[in-house]
């Protein structure tokens, strides 16, 4: 029991020590998408990048996809040159785990429009960024720095009716950043289902 407590304390302290901070360089990664293509953060230097942690079985994620909110954001910003990477970190056997073909079918059915859907079943990318919930959003600027992390909006509910009345932190941050303005709200508390790591 004592060893378990010490191990837990070490994990908490390690996570706190290496927690991402706004303005820090975003951690480098390479991941494979649902079509088998590799994506490296380094390849997108000079572009804004959005990382969206998702889980199609999570009611909070469902809220943003059934309302069309997430797809609308994806289309709006990828049309402006933003790279939008949806990340699936659910482990095999856990809620939200998808094979490549299952994810491609889901993306088509949901009319989703990310640049790519990255498969992260071992949770390596999720742990690298400290992704806690679905959705959990991160924005990286063209210089490779983290400029926003947290919730998608200010209504932490599963109610689709709340979407039109919400302040969308991601949309606001991207609008400000792509206009050359400082991002006013750089970090918020993410809400949603916990990421289903093993």
Task: Specify the residue positions occupied by each region the protein language model found.
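Sec/Tat signal peptide C-region and signal peptidase I cleavage site
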Residues: 13-19
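Short active-site neighborhood of thiol/selenol oxidoreductases, capturing the structured segment around
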Residues: 42-63, 174
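A short beta-strand-turn-helix
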Residues: 29-49
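Thiol-/selenol-based redox modules, centered on thioredoxin-like
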Residues: 139-198
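Cleaved targeting-peptide boundary
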Residues: 19-27
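Structural microenvironment flanking redox-active thiols in thiol-disulfide oxidoreductases
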Residues: 62-110, 121-128
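Sec-dependent N-terminal signal peptides
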Residues: 4-13
């Amino acid at each position: 029991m004592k060893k378990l407590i010490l191990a837990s304390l070490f994990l908490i302290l390690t996570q706190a020590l290496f927690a991402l901070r706004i303005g820090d360089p975003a951690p480098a990664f390479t991941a494979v998408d649902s079509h088998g293509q590799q994506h490296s953060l380094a390849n997108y230097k000079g572009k804004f990048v959005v990382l969206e942690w998702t889980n199609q079985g999570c009611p909070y994620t469902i809220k943003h996809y059934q309302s069309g909110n997430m797809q609308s954001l994806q289309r709006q910003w990828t049309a402006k040159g933003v790279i939008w990477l949806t990340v699936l970190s659910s482990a095999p056997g856990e809620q939200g785990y998808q094979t490549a073909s299952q994810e491609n079918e889901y993306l088509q059915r949901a009319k989703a429009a990310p640049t790519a859907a990255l498969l992260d079943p071992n949770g390596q990318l999720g742990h690298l960024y400290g992704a806690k919930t679905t959705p959990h959003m991160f924005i990286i600027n063209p210089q490779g720095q983290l400029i926003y992390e947290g919730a998608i909006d200010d209504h932490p509910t599963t109610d689709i009716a709340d979407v039109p009345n919400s302040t969308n932190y991601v949309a606001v941050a991207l609008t400000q950043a792509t206009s050359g303005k400082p991002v006013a709200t750089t970090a918020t508390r993410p809400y949603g289902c916990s990421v289903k790591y093993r």
